[in-house]
Every structure is written in C-alpha cells, then in structure tokens.
C-alpha cells in the first residue's frame, strides 16, 4: 500500500511513520506548511507548524530512509481554519480549530492531493483506531490509551475519509511507550515536548489574536435580569462557562462567583450567572457528519463535547428534512458549560458514529 505519512515534526507522527514503514508499506513523508504568521516563522517558537518542526520532520524521514516533501497548504489553512475560527468567535460561538483542520486540511486537502498522486491512505500520529467491521467497512474507534485518545477531533471524518485513514499509534498502550520506541529507534524528536497551543496562536493569547482581527466592539456584561455589571471590548473574548476576566465591576450580591451563560454578539452583551445555570439537559446540533449509518429514530448512545471530556449517556435522534437534519440529544447525565460551536461526537461503545456542531442547548433548570 502507498501511504502518505503526515509528519508534523513531533514524536507521534515520526513513530507513526516508522510503524507504517515496518508494516511493509511504501511510505512517503510530507510536512504541511500551514502557517505564515511571524510567530511561527522562526526557530524556537511555541506551537506547531514552525520552521523548526519542518526540520525535525525532515530529520526523522531521513533516519527512516523515506522520501520527504513539504507541501504548502497555508492558503487552505488560512481560509478553512483561521478565518473560520475568527468568524465563529465573532458570531458568539466557540469553535475547535483542530476539528476543522482534520476535516478540511489533513483529511480533505491533504488526502485529496494524496489520492490524486496515487496514494492509498494518509497516516497520522493521532491516537485512534481504524477497525474493519463485520460488514467489511472501516470503523473509527477510540485508542487503546484512553488518556491520549483523540477520536473526538476525528469524529468529523466521513466514511470515505475513515476508509483512507491510518493511525499506527492507535494500539499503543501509553504515550510513554511511544516515546520509548522513538528513543530505541534513534528518532531525533524522542524527547520533544508535546504542543498544547493553537498552532496559529503560539503565545496562547486567543483574546489578543481575535482583537487584532476584529478590533474593539464594546458592549455590556449583564446578569439574567438585564442589570449591567460591567463592560467589555468584544464578545469574542468570552466563551460559555468562563469564570475569569469577565469585566465585572462589582461582586455579586450573594458573593458567589459568576460564569458566562450566553453571548449575544448582535446586541453586544455577555450574560453571566451562577454555576448551576450552566447545567445542560439537552442540546441541538447541525451539519452532522456520519462515518457509520446515521441513527434512525431515538437511539441510546454516548456523547462527548470536549476533546478531553468524559463521554456521557444520551438519547440521540435526527429530526427535520433529510437534506438539512437537526441532531437532537437528550442527556442522561447533565453537562456543564456547553457552548454553541463546539463539536458533539457520538459514540456506541468505543466506535465513533459521527459528529455535529452544537447550535443550541436547553438548561437543566
């Protein structure tokens, strides 16, 4: 099998490429140049997609003895990930750029280009598993290492994308074992730290990044009765469930902390309230993508709304017209701080069935 190994310059993608080579595949390494921002076009910068990362990926490919290329996908990335990120925050929603990158870059732009060049699959360093089901179709499952499982950010893949995906680290028992394997192989990135930042915001200042893009859009911070508690310079600086940096000029009368309950960018208001008002008993989601058969009628599933969140039992049902359905989810266990724009991933056991983008929630009380 001809395999295109996406090599980010980190330890996971390097070991994944090595395992693909060991499996007897014809492997070609490719590093995606995604970002041209000044913060990433220097060595030693944080995040990923830096020049240093490209050099590390090349060193790993050289050690493995595989061809290596750098593909410039920066225009796709800016349009499909960065611009989308800014637009979503401007609309009062909370996007996950890693989900969008997997959907539109790694398993769309990269995969499409790879297939056009005669490759059969794209291999990445994600912690997830592709399993052949009883019907012969490829199924997406959680990784063996629950602590590192990344199936949530891959839940946006459709059935064809899953069929062309390869995750060689899916059966790795722990990340420590992956690092130990990299050390045994002599890979130069064996001890390289993991990246935890949004790659196009290497300093971690999301609010500052958005302010540069959107400018000041002043408004009010209010309680549920509409009483003004403070002011803000842009609703994009807030997300549902946020506690710190609210811009409240005085404490609540009961002395309890306040959290962001909702964001209304048109009215330029941020509504805050007590923690119990964050509890959600149901949610609605749109733009569903299924890599399994779409659920028919109410079905018992588990859902997850954050990359490292706990899955909770729920009843899911598709409603509305077939060409534009709404996924309605009734939670068996309430969740807290669920924001529009987040991805809800749907599971049956360890299998990922699909995902959708949360458009609204129903408070528990």
From Swiss-Prot:
Q: Which UniProt keywords apply?
A: ATP-binding, Cytoplasm, Disulfide bond, Nucleotide-binding, RNA-binding, Transferase, tRNA processing, tRNA-binding
Q: Active-site residues? A: 101, 199
Q: Which GO terms describe its biological process?
A: tRNA wobble position uridine thiolation
Instruction: Give its localization.
Output: Cytoplasm
Can you tell which superkingdom this protein's organism belongs to?
Answer: Bacteria
InterPro entries xref list = MnmA-like, MnmA-like_C, MnmA-like_central, MnmA-like_central_sf, Rossmann-like_a/b/a_fold
Any idea which positions bind ATP? 6-13, 32, 125
| Known catalytic reactions | S-sulfanyl-L-cysteinyl-[protein] + uridine(34) in tRNA + AH2 + ATP = 2-thiouridine(34) in tRNA + L-cysteinyl-[protein] + A + AMP + diphosphate + H(+)
Q: What is its EC number?
A: 2.8.1.13
Q: GO cellular component annotations, sorted alphabetically?
A: cytoplasm
Q: Which Gene3D superfamilies match?
A: Adenine nucleotide alpha hydrolases-like domains, HUPs, Translation factors
Residue(s) at site: Interaction with tRNA: 126, 342
Q: Which Cys-Cys disulphide bridges does the record give?
A: 101-199
Name one molecular function that GO assigns to this entry: ATP binding
Q: Region Interaction with tRNA: start and end of each range?
A: 148-150
Q: Which family does it belong to?
A: Belongs to the MnmA/TRMU family.
Q: What does this protein do?
A: Catalyzes the 2-thiolation of uridine at the wobble position (U34) of tRNA, leading to the formation of s(2)U34.
Q: What name appears for this protein in its UniProt entry?
A: tRNA-specific 2-thiouridylase MnmA
The organism encoding this protein is: Kineococcus radiotolerans (strain ATCC BAA-149 / DSM 14245 / SRS30216)
Recall the taxonomic lineage recorded for the source organism: Bacteria, Bacillati, Actinomycetota, Actinomycetes, Kineosporiales
């Amino acid at each position: 099998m001809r395999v295109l190994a996406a090599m980010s310059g980190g330890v996971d993608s390097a070991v994944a490429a090595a395992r693909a080579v060991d499996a007897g595949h014809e492997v070609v390494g490719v590093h995606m140049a995604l970002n041209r921002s000044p913060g990433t076009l220097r060595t030693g910068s944080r995040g990923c997609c830096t020049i240093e990362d490209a050099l590390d990926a090349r060193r790993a490919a050289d050690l493995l003895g595989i061809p290596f290329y750098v593909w410039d996908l920066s225009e796709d990335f800016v349009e499909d990930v960065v611009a989308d990120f800014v637009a979503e925050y401007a609309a009062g929603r909370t996007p996950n750029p890693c989900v969008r990158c997997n959907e539109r870059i790694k398993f769309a732009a990269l995969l499409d280009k790879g297939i056009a060049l005669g490759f059969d699959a794209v291999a990445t360093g994600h912690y997830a598993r592709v399993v052949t089901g009883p019907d012969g179709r490829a199924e997406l499952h959680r990784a063996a290492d629950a602590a590192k499982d990344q199936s949530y950010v891959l839940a946006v893949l459709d059935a064809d994308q899953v069929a062309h995906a390869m995750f060689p680290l899916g059966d790795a028992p722990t990340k420590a074992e992956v690092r130990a394997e990299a050390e045994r192989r002599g890979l130069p990135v064996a001890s390289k730290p993991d990246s935890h930042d949004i790659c196009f915001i290497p300093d971690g200042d999301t609010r500052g990044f958005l302010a540069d893009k959107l400018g000041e859009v002043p408004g009010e911070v209010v309680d549920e009765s509409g009483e003004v508690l403070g002011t803000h310079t842009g609703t994009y600086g807030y997300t549902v469930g946020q506690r710190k940096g609210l811009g409240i000029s005085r404490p609540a009368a009961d002395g309890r902390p306040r959290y962001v309950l909702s964001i209304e960018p048109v009215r330029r208001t941020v509504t805050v309230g007590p923690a119990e008002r964050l509890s959600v008993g149901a949610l609605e989601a749109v733009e569903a993508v299924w890599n399994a058969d779409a659920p028919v009628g109410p079905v018992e599933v588990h859902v997850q709304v954050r990359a490292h969140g706990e899955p909770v039992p729920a009843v899911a049902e598709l409603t509305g017209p077939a060409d534009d359905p709404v996924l309605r989810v009734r939670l068996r266990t309430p969740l807290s701080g669920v924001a529009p724009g987040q991805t809800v991933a749907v599971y049956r056991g360890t299998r990922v069935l699909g995902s959708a983008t949360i458009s609204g929630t129903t408070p528990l009380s």
